[in-house]
Regions:
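Short, charged low-complexity linear segments at domain edges
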Residues: 1-10, 228-254
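Canonical Radical SAM [4Fe-4S] cluster-binding loop centered on the CxxxCxxC motif
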Residues: 4-41, 268
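Core AdoMet radical
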Residues: 28-39, 53-68, 80-98, 110-142, ...
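Short Fe-S-cluster ligation motifs
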Residues: 46-66, 286-294
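Conserved C-terminal portion of the radical SAM core fold
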Residues: 58, 113-116, 139-201, 210-236
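Distinct, well-ordered alpha-helical segments
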Residues: 70-77, 98-108, 167-175
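Short, electropositive alpha-helical surface patch
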Residues: 77-80, 167-183, 239-256
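Flexible mid-to-C-terminal extensions adjoining Fe-S/redox cofactors in radical SAM and related proteins
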Residues: 240-294
């Protein structure tokens, strides 16, 4: 994470805390018990004050940013005052918003120019709670999503693709369509092989080649139902061609890289590339040197 704003970066974020009330088994940045809330709050307020006014977007992340409590709203109001044209992307597990009073406090900051990204790991409560390592996570996250919708916020639903989540991707798509049709975006996200993913390799790691059928079915059905679905963090060479148009260049510039053979690939300019931070990559990586017409 940077401590300054780079106007040319695709990943300007305010890091609120390393603490989290989830302990997700594939977390790329494992939580800490260190109390860094005060220090980071003061630092972030200064970063916002010195940020260029033409900044397009600014993320708020952690850990879990809502652990900042009411000071989260102070920070957001400060952003809106200093950077009125900047889009705010708040990443949260959503659980704090199960308290409608907390959701309404965020609403008082204004619902414009703010997108809230929340992960949902499964349509099955047991799977979601297992991944989050908390028995209340699924219920509180769902209630948080509903409360944010009632307050008028745009929500990005995030699904991190791993061995646990991939087995039920088609069912997950159906669950989203029936229960969460109001979400603005659905982001299906490839796994970054670092942090807890390394520790829990046998539980969470799956080569993207192995879940392409499930990913294709889920993605195409969500799109057919009129929902805005995208695929993050998976290079074109491991995706079915039918999914290329849903793939976006999503990896933060400071941890984005391409293999040497990617220079030979016809799709490099459209491809997200690879996580430089990942200790393991798909066996399917290869340059695309020929594109057959459908």
């Amino acid at each position: 994470m940077r401590d300054i704003i780079d106007i040319n970066s695709n990943d300007n974020v305010l890091f609120v805390t390393s603490q989290c009330n989830n302990r997700c088994i594939m977390c790329c940045q494992p939580p800490s018990k260190v109390n860094d809330l005060d220090r980071n709050f003061e630092k972030n307020m200064k970063i916002v004050s010195s940020a260029p006014k033409e900044l397009i977007s600014l993320g708020i992340t952690g850990g879990e940013p809502t652990l900042l409590g009411d000071r989260l709203f102070t920070l957001i109001n400060h952003i809106k005052a200093e950077l009125p044209n900047t889009e705010i992307h708040l990443l949260s597990n959503g659980r704090a918003f199960s308290n409608m009073l907390f959701a309404k406090k965020l609403k008082e900051c204004g619902t414009d120019k703010i997108l809230i990204g929340i992960p949902l790991h499964s349509d099955c409560a047991a799977d979601h709670n297992y991944i989050a390592q908390d028995t209340n996570a699924f219920e509180e996250t769902l209630q948080g999503l509903y409360n944010l919708e009632r307050c008028g916020f745009d929500v990005e639903l995030r699904v991190v693709l791993n061995k646990v989540t991939c087995k039920r991707l088609p069912q997950m798509a159906n669950f989203i369509y029936r229960n969460l049709p109001f979400v603005r975006y659905i982001s299906l996200m490839g796994l970054e092989y670092t942090g807890f993913t390394i520790k829990n390799h046998d539980i969470v790691w799956i080569d993207p080649l192995e879940y392409q059928n499930e990913l294709e079915k889920a993605t195409l059905e969500l799109a057919r139902w009129g929902l805005n679905v995208s695929i993050f963090n998976l290079p074109h060479c491991v995706l079915k061609k039918s999914l290329w148009k849903y793939s976006v260049k999503s990896i933060s510039d400071w941890k984005n890289e391409y293999a040497e053979f990617c220079d030979e690939c016809l799709m490099k300019d459209n491809c997200c590339g690879l996580f430089a931070t990942s200790r393991r990559q798909s066996e399917g990586l290869k340059p695309i040197t020929e594109i057959q017409c459908d």
